[in-house]
């Protein structure tokens, strides 16, 4: 069992913060070269001898085919479900993608193997849950922190909805696959991690002002993952084995923190709300969907600038009173300003994103300036969460 999983299980069982933590059912986590070689033995031990590999054409070529050969050589029955793109659009976690998987899955499957990046895992997570079967995560790119998550973000009728389903029972992160990932997906994973710069502040704000649940141990797990990425940005930018290992470890750590906590608060704040807002706009227009982490990284730049400038000034001069939330903003003014000071400067976030080839301007995402401004004004309404963006738009604008 990997040290990350041991640490997460220890936090889940020993933490005394008062918040009810989720017990982690996952019992195997392998990260390294040839990690996939541990898979056949694991499946035999569990009696899971009929598997369905879920992949797309690219991830099957990179990893799925090798996994299938390995398992067949050890007497395990393998069915392949290769998901296809919808015309000119990339594969999405939507009704079309889910329909392909439901139709293509073998009836006698004991376990699903998600061989791919975020979309493949989201589709496999919700389909396996609906079938009442477990699934195993085999990421092919260090692109998101949701590989270990219970949440499955699915697009339904053009709206992104997160369903709480199930986490994988095991994760095999093989560096032989991960080091082949396109640079854009590495940059996306790094952008997803940089998003914790603002999400951790929003989480503390929501706890302070609105008494939303908080856990110091989960906070420090997520903060450690973020710090590790920022301190090793050069290695990640080089896309060498050590850099990919560190980024993957950070993404897994962040995902386990969310799994323990039972909510996405640690890893998802206003920067993710902007990303979701843009994603739905791209869906409505039929435009090419930028990678999730690319949107999150750029949104983190915007939120940093907004919080450290406009929000700071509004809080410093805030004189409002009335509702419990407004009174709480006034009461915690100094603490709010201290939290804002912990956010990296927008220029520093930009420099880090540039180093890995991430999106640093709206044109990099084919994002209209008007949509950027619109998201800053409206994205806080997508989630019932007391982020600093929510406070700014709903209570501080007129102060």
UniProtKB/Swiss-Prot annotation:
The record's free-text note on cofactor binding: Binds 1 nickel ion per subunit.
The organism's place on the tree of life at top rank: Bacteria
Cofactor: Ni(2+)
BP-aspect Gene Ontology terms: glycerophospholipid metabolic process; phospholipid biosynthetic process
Pfam families tied to this protein: Fe-ADH_2 (PF13685)
Keywords annotated in UniProt: Cytoplasm, Lipid biosynthesis, Lipid metabolism, Metal-binding, NAD, NADP, Nickel, Oxidoreductase, Phospholipid biosynthesis, Phospholipid metabolism
Gene Ontology MF terms in the entry: glycerol-1-phosphate dehydrogenase (NAD+) activity; glycerol-1-phosphate dehydrogenase (NADP+) activity; metal ion binding
The protein's assembly and partners: Homodimer.
Protein name, UniProt field: Glycerol-1-phosphate dehydrogenase [NAD(P)+]
